[in-house]
């Protein structure tokens, strides 16, 4: 990908909070893990995101925790993800044909959006993973418990400039219960197509 961004957003009371707008402090743990924390005025309430590199595979394990923030409805926590694919080959048309958004419901085989046209899709089942694929490499978001079937959307838009291939979008939700601590566990796959 050329560029991208992602974040969690949710409502705290009647105010929308997006983790892309928060200030985080970082704490490194060994050589393979970093923990980011957004504090509040109450030290018992915070949001924490941990990233851990897998030393054997192409995975980055990610955990987002809301601690002590009980007025957030965890079912409304959305993971917003956008990427713009970079064109790397001389034969751009071939690249466009091999770039796409793939997804897999728990009870089904993998499926994909149009590789030639703009398409948006509301996912209608519990989804195991969503992947943004280019010619040789893929970036995927995987949830072992599955993303919620309530409200998720994915999309793809072919781009017309000579530098980029497509814009990829995903909005994913989680089936979580309210509690003193809410935890969202996922993993990224960042590696070659198999």
What is the predicted role of each segment?
Residues 1-194:
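Soluble non-transmembrane domains of integral membrane proteins
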């Amino acid at each position: 990908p050329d560029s991208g961004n992602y974040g969690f957003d949710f409502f705290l009371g009647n105010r929308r909070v997006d983790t892309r707008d928060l200030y985080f402090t970082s704490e490194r743990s060994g050589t393979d893990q970093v923990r980011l924390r957004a504090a509040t005025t109450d030290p018992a309430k915070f949001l924490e995101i941990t990233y851990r590199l897998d030393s054997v595979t192409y995975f980055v394990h990610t955990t987002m925790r809301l601690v002590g923030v009980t007025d957030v409805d965890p079912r409304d926590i959305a993971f917003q993800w956008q990427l713009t694919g970079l064109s790397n080959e001389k034969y751009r048309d071939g690249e466009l044909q091999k770039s796409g958004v793939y997804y897999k419901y728990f009870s089904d085989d993998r499926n994909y959006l149009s590789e030639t046209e703009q398409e948006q899709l509301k996912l209608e089942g519990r989804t195991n993973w969503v992947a943004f694929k280019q010619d040789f490499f893929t970036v995927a978001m995987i949830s072992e418990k599955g993303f919620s079937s309530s409200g998720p959307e994915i999309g793809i838009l072919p781009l017309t400039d000579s530098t980029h291939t497509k814009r990829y979008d995903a909005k994913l939700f989680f089936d979580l219960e309210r509690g003193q601590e809410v935890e969202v566990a996922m993993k990224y796959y960042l590696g070659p197509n198999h």
